[in-house]
From Swiss-Prot:
The gene is hslO. This is 33 kDa chaperonin. It comes from Prochlorococcus marinus (strain NATL2A). GO terms for biological process: protein refolding. NCBIfam families: PRK00114.1. GO terms for molecular function: protein folding chaperone; unfolded protein binding. Pfam families: HSP33. Under oxidizing conditions two disulfide bonds are formed involving the reactive cysteines. Under reducing conditions zinc is bound to the reactive cysteines and the protein is inactive.
Length: 299
């Protein structure tokens, strides 16, 4: 089944809602990077969050990059998502696995805080016009949801609730997705809406369990929290979009990257190896560049 993203509003346009499923995208990331259970969860959550943020970009070619730089054993994370529904990403240590811990509900969960450690979340928004907008906030707990909510509050001054989660068992990834609910600028001084948003979100005890219950029915997921949507289900479906793991790497980009190395470095490659092999960090595609191609880059 294809991943997707839907948008809706509630409270007469005062609250913006976006829901996304990233089950298949997370499965592909797991396969490409040989992710562990823990890193599959982290990558899935980060892909969901980045797609939720990218959904508000004004232009279809707009992109959002999430980066975690910290002292934890995860050794960093980078996710790149587009307004067009494309997403890709990787972590520093894809094989990382840690003991499960008990949460406040006495259920076992992944130890995201220990995995990420102490550090920062960087959010880069690029609409293709001028310099990208870069924001940095301290990590809250590494579970991505609260970290993104902190970014939205401190960097964009937007009261928001961000939920990301997954269901993973011994057979693999069952589901992965996220939900964003935020007060729109025109209603940000309406404190009754802020109270409404807080009250509705408090009703969510476990987003991962709710996500698993609803499967890929994103409209039902939103209605579980905001049953009084402004749009009908058919209207929401008509504006939904597909989400997919898609890398922007190509052979042409690989050749351009090699050319930047300069004549001396290319001649060294030709002399020592007679070829070059480049591996994309985001998708693990391998590009083999033969000797004659290296020579042509020098000429």
């Amino acid at each position: 089944m294809t991943d997707s993203l839907v948008r809706a509003t509630a409270a007469k346009g005062g609250i913006r809602l976006v829901a996304v499923s990233t089950t298949e995208s997370t499965k592909e990331a797991k396969e490409r990077h040989s992710l562990s259970y823990l890193t599959s969860a982290i990558v899935g959550r980060a892909m969901s969050a980045s797609l939720l943020l990218a959904s508000s970009m004004k232009v279809n070619h707009g992109r959002v990059t999430l980066r975690i730089s910290s002292n934890g054993p995860l050794k960093g994370l980078t996710i790149d998502a587009g307004r067009d529904g494309s997403v890709r990403g990787y972590v520093g240590d894809p094989s990382l696995e840690l003991d499960l811990i008990k949460n406040k509900s006495n259920h076992y969960t992944f130890d995201f805080k220990k995995a990420t450690g102490i550090g920062y979340l960087h959010v880069i928004r690029d609409d293709g016009k001028g310099e990208p907008h870069n924001s940095t906030v301290e990590l809250i707990n590494g579970g991505i949801g609260e970290d993104i909510a902190s970014y939205l509050l401190h960097s964009e001054q937007t009261p928001s609730a961000v939920f990301v989660g997954e269901k993973i068992n011994q057979d693999g990834i069952v589901c992965s997705g996220g939900l964003l609910a935020q007060i729109l600028p025109k209603a940000e001084r309406d404190y009754s809406l802020i109270d409404l948003l807080e009250d509705r979100c408090k009703e969510i005890n476990s987003f991962s369990e709710l996500l698993n219950k609803k499967g890929n029915n994103l409209i039902s997921l939103i209605e579980e929290i905001f049953p009084d949507l402004d749009q009908s289900p058919s209207d929401i479906i008509s504006t939904s979009q597909e989400v997919h793991f898609k890398c922007r790497c190509s052979r042409e980009r690989s050749l351009s990257a090699l050319k930047i190395l300069g004549k001396d470095e290319l001649q060294k490659m030709i002399k020592e190896d007679g070829k070059a092999e480049l591996t994309c960090q985001f998708c693990k595609n391998v590009y083999l560049v033969k000797e004659d191609e290296l020579i042509s880059l020098i000429d």
